[in-house]
Amino acid sequence: MTVYRTGTDSVLMRSLIRAAQNGKEVTVVVELMARFDEEANIGWATRLEEVGAHVVYGVVGYKTHAKMLMIVRREEERHGSVLRRYVHLGTGNYHPRTARLYTDFGLLTCDPDVGLDVNEVFKQLTGLGRAQTLKHLWQAPFALHANIIAAIEEETKAARAGKRARIIAKMNSLLEPETIRKLYEASQAGVRIDLIVRGVCTLRPGIKGLSENIRVRSIIGRFLEHHRIFYFHAGGKENVILSSADWMDRNFFRRIE
């Protein structure tokens, strides 16, 4: 499991401690540089180590901002026992307080290919493996930015060919220069783009000849809009990507996402 923010009173962290005490093999990737949560994370890391959990601190030089949880179980089937991976991937932190106040999405799956990708990422984070080409996950700092750029470019090509093209993206911040430039190019090609950005956005929408096909808005309501979700028409395949990353330099290039 990865831990970025979890607070001082976490049922989930207590459950991990209990699992380790009950003889389960528990590995936790704890980010000690999560701003304002450093003390809480150090405390949980110490308690986990005391009960025999394997605690690691990610990759030197990169913050581990991804939100991933994997449970591996041996299950009996007709042809014998098999190891099955259950995986949770989220846009938000495993934090009891923000889980009540923020809007986030999560995917819970036992799909073997997704489980294999997550397993490879955990091997990399714990020092047991190197970065691999993943089938379903777009991982920063290796492939996420390049894949986002490629997806925008595909919509641009479709629009120039007179085909349907559409981009909808929701995030907390939009700052990364190359991504913004590619969105401008897509707009000029005729791609209709809706951006829902909660915080800082340096893209300028509605400028004739540059961004007249781009609309930017924020949603203000009872809950803090925290999830990141990106939609690309993709020639009718309609790709939808959930992410822990905003479109910022730090997320694309200096964090594990």
Predicted regions, residues:
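Short, compositionally biased "basic patch" segments
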Residues: 113-132, 147
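PLD/PLD-like phosphodiesterase catalytic module centered on the HKD motif
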Residues: 5, 11-12, 16, 22-99, ...
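Gly-rich Lys/Arg/Thr-decorated short loops/hinges at beta-loop-alpha junctions or inter-strand turns
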Residues: 128-137, 162-164
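Short acidic catalytic loops
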Residues: 1-2
